[in-house]
Amino acid sequence: MALTKPDVDVLVVGGGLGGLSTALFLARRGARVLLVERHASTSVLPKAAGQNPRTMELFRFGGVADEILATDDIRGAQGDFTIKVVERVGGRVPAQLRESFEELVGATEQCTPMPWALAPQDRVEPVLVAHAAKHGAEIRFATELTSFQAGDDGVTARLRDLGTGAESTVSARYLVAADGPRSAIRESLGITRHGHGTLAHFMGVIFEADLTAVVPPGSTGWYYLQHPDFTGTFGPTDRPNRHTFYVRYDPERGERPEDYTPQRCTELIRLAVDAPGLVPDILDIQAWDMAAYIADRWREGPVLLVGDAAKVTPPTGGMGGNTAIGHGFDVAWKLAAVLRGEAGERLLDSYGADGSLVSRLVVDESLAIYAQRMAPHLLGSVPEERGTAQVVLGFRYRSTAVAAEDDDPEPTEDPRRPSGRPGFRAPHVWIEQDGTRRSTVELFGDCWVLLAAPEGGAWGQAAARAARIWASASTSISSAAMSPPPPAN
């Protein structure tokens, strides 16, 4: 197969958080991107809610951080965020996990200039779509991938418009598979997965009801329910009187998703909130599996995996959607570097090496939290918690793309005491640039960056020469001469 002039640089299949982030970050770097999503629109359900500071740093790079924070309607209540293990909402609290946003912020605020956020997925995805399109990405909803052929020169894909039935062919230099945990692309390539597998089966219910007598207005708490009749979770959303309820079911006991009718879910919600006369408005009921998997390969020729296609993690800890956004950022800048001629194909191999390492940290942390809150029988068989700050801000990349200067095997460090060694996230340090106090984190974004002390003039001159040489290739190099910030008044 010879693709001399592909229709697009990158075809992204799947319009969730991972796929949309990939499209946004690629488009910002000038790549020609087509994203197809089989659903008719972005998510209509809250799904993955919450953005950790690392994700907010990436969103700042993508130019969407302020807009995401503006959609975060319940952010003002972060200080009251608590996680309770209870029999029913509003009942006796045998265990309360001291995990308030105040404590989480305390563990990370000295490591980053960006805040935590609580925006739900149905608010985030439209923002990503709008900004990706603004930068030139083409987004097609109600469009599915029916088949593809991959070779050394790229990919030829067949697409079907689900509205009209019309089929078309598109050629691309690369294909990014963001088609979810049951990724048809991954399976067609024979890429296997490893991990703990399916941990539990749940029914997810979105409903509306006035629960102000049980849940204080504006509450952002999350409840793990250990009721005599069921195990589940309950939490509010950013919309008034809209709530989420997840209940575990067990196929080995003959329980089936179809058993959870609106009537049955109403009965369980009444038990969960101790309100026998409640009449909830059931908006959605969906079955889903809690699982832990990591793909054995993240790249097969011109095809790369992101999001749940690459790794699946329990939602405990809230890191699944955040990790998918991180995948999108990493795969985008590496693809863009190869497309621009700044790097060779081997750089793409480092994407899977680095991504799988961080995903192992995320899965292990999520499993530890799951065991603590919902599955005590797993305690001792899963790794101990490292802590959110270390996993989110203290991870280290160890691929061949990193010029490591030591052989320390530890995959994380305390981000409150950053070492600045190669492979770790650039430390957050307040500096003065052009008379303005800003964070070193704010210096990064869509281009290569050189940080130099005031005496590093030769490095700055070299960066300027490189920028002139690469100017015709749309490559951008930024250098920053740093000085300590002035003393705070």
From Swiss-Prot:
- Under Enzyme Commission nomenclature, its number is 1.14.13.180
The record's annotation in InterPro entries points to: FAD-bd, FAD/NAD-bd_sf, RIFMO-like
This protein's source sits in the domain of life called Bacteria
**Start and end residues of each stretch annotated as Disordered:** 402-428
- Which cofactors is this protein said to need? FAD
Pathway recorded for this protein: Antibiotic biosynthesis; daunorubicin biosynthesis; Antibiotic biosynthesis; carminomycin biosynthesis; Antibiotic biosynthesis; rhodomycin biosynthesis; Antibiotic biosynthesis; doxorubicin biosynthesis
Positions binding aklavinone in this chain are: G317
Cystine links in this protein are none
* Residue positions binding FAD: L17, G18, E37, Q121, L145, D308
Q: What happens when the gene is disrupted?
A: Cells lacking this gene do not produce epsilon-rhodomycinone and accumulate 11-deoxycarminomycin and 11-deoxydaunorubicin.
One of the GO BP terms on file: doxorubicin metabolic process
* Reaction(s) the record says it catalyses: aklavinone + NADPH + O2 + H(+) = epsilon-rhodomycinone + NADP(+) + H2O
Q: Name one GO molecular function term.
A: oxidoreductase activity, acting on paired donors, with incorporation or reduction of molecular oxygen, NAD(P)H as one donor, and incorporation of one atom of oxygen
Alphabetized UniProt keyword annotations = Antibiotic biosynthesis, FAD, Flavoprotein, NAD, NADP, Nucleotide-binding, Oxidoreductase
Q: Where is the active site?
A: Y224
Q: What else is known?
A: S.peucetius subsp. caesius ATCC 27952, a mutant strain derived from S.peucetius ATCC 29050, is the only organism reported to produce doxorubicin in vivo.
Q: Which family does the entry's similarity section mention?
A: Belongs to the PheA/TfdB FAD monooxygenase family.
> Subunit structure, briefly?
Monomer.
Function, in words: Involved in the biosynthesis of the anthracyclines carminomycin, rhodomycin, daunorubicin (daunomycin) and doxorubicin (adriamycin) which are aromatic polyketide antibiotics that exhibit high cytotoxicity and are widely applied in the chemotherapy of a variety of cancers.
What this protein is called in its record is Aklavinone 12-hydroxylase DnrF
